[in-house]
């Protein structure tokens, strides 16, 4: 029987071999790709989206949290936003009036993720307690904000990093976790339907940070991980990932499907956003910025979102910048961080309203801001 030292040696050799093959595959793909989206678009005479500093303005500042804002989500149909903060509360906001309709005090204050149910009647949240809690917003809360939990989803062995309801299904929810897995839940029973990763060899090998469900085909979702990869999953086949996407050189913090459902975007600690083709596995474009002028360091990408057409990519950064990228030409058309009433801290989360008319950003400065296209500006 092989000793521990021999097994470690074999494991190291196998890992080196895999990394070598992966690098050869990456180089081979680069030779086959004679262009990228930006070069092709420029060759066809496409011009950047014209943006002025007054075209996207901060129309609301949502103040009420007493700690860093970590996560936010919009309702699919109505103008409501839920936010999760280091202060241990979920707040539900009316995006039109800035009024708080709920301020839910959580049993575990270390919350990292939140999501609205498709019908807007429930919210989910998860964090360092390794559980996902469901609250029915029709339940009565006491004067301190304590509200009964309608369901607690337990089973993860690490923190819950993100959660998202399956579109148009109030009873299905997907979570990602520091235990290297994603889980599909039946919210009604509180039971796990499927586990993605874990003991399966095609799963992630480090913390899973983010998930995004394909609204065009809700059987498919992608997950981004600290193992620098993104994996595509089919909820009908949990035993293996459909495809693994390489390209990033550090943790993948955010993943988001493109509006057409055929591509998806990513944001990473390596300071770049990337666009991938879901079907071919090819990386279509890299959106890379210059280092921060003050620190000379490359800010990390914390969160991303697409405009309703997909022409714009919004990317939040650790230094407080929020870039608006032209996805076709890979050029920055606006930095919300330079505008009046911008955040004074790390952008931790952002999300686009379902009709594409407004962007909400959350920050470590304890505030959320709603950015809307000005009256004369056509929604892109």
Swiss-Prot record:
The keyword Repeat applies. Keywords: Repeat, Transducer, WD repeat. SUPFAM superfamilies: WD40 repeat-like (SSF50978). Present in the root, leaf and tassel. GO terms for molecular function: signaling receptor complex adaptor activity. One of its GO terms (biological process) is defense response to fungus. CDD domains: WD40. One of its GO terms (cellular component) is cytoplasm. It comes from the Eukaryota. WD repeats lie at residues 64-94, 106-136, 155-186, 203-234, 247-277, 296-326, 342-372. The keyword Kinase does not apply. Guanine nucleotide-binding proteins (G proteins) are involved as a modulator or transducer in various transmembrane signaling systems. The beta and gamma chains are required for the GTPase activity, for replacement of GDP by GTP, and for G protein-effector interaction. G proteins are composed of 3 units, alpha, beta and gamma. Belongs to the WD repeat G protein beta family. This is Guanine nucleotide-binding protein subunit beta.
């Amino acid at each position: 029987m092989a000793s521990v030292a021999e097994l470690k040696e074999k494991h190291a050799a196998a890992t080196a071999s895999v990394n070598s093959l992966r690098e050869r595959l990456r180089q081979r793909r680069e030779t086959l790709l004679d262009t990228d989206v930006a070069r092709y678009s420029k060759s066809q005479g496409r011009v950047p989206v014209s943006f002025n500093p007054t075209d996207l303005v901060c129309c609301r500042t949502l103040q009420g949290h007493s700690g860093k804002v970590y996560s936010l989500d919009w309702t699919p149909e109505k103008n409501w936003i839920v936010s999760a903060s280091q202060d241990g509360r979920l707040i539900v906001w009316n995006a039109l009036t800035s009024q708080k309709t709920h301020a839910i005090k959580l049993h575990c204050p270390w919350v990292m993720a939140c999501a609205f149910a498709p019908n807007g009647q429930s919210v989910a949240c998860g964090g360092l307690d390794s559980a996902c809690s469901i609250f029915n917003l029709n339940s009565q809360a006491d004067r301190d904000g304590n509200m009964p939990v309608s369901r607690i989803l337990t089973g993860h062995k690490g923190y819950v990093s993100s959660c998202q309801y399956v579109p148009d299904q109030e009873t299905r929810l997907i979570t990602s976790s520091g235990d290297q897995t994603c889980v599909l839940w039946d919210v009604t029973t509180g039971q796990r339907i499927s586990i993605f990763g874990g003991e399966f060899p095609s799963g992630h090998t480090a913390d899973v940070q983010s998930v995004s469900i394909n609204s065009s085909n809700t059987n498919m979702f992608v997950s981004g991980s600290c193992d620098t990869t993104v994996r595509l999953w089919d909820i009908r086949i949990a035993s293996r990932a459909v495809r693994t996407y390489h390209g990033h050189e550090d943790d993948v913090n955010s993943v988001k499907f493109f509006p057409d459902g055929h591509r998806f975007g990513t944001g990473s600690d390596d300071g770049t956003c990337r666009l991938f083709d879901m079907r071919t596995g090819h990386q279509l474009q890299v959106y890379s910025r210059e280092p921060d002028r003050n620190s000379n360091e490359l800010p990390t990408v914390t969160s991303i979102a697409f405009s309703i057409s997909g022409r714009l990519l919004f990317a939040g950064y650790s230094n407080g910048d929020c870039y608006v990228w032209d996805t076709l030409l890979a050029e920055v058309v606006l930095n919300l961080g330079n505008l009046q009433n911008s955040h004074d801290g790390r952008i931790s989360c952002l999300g686009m309203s379902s009709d594409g008319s407004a962007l909400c950003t959350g920050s470590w400065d304890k505030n959320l801001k709603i950015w809307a296209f000005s009256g004369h500006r056509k929604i892109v």
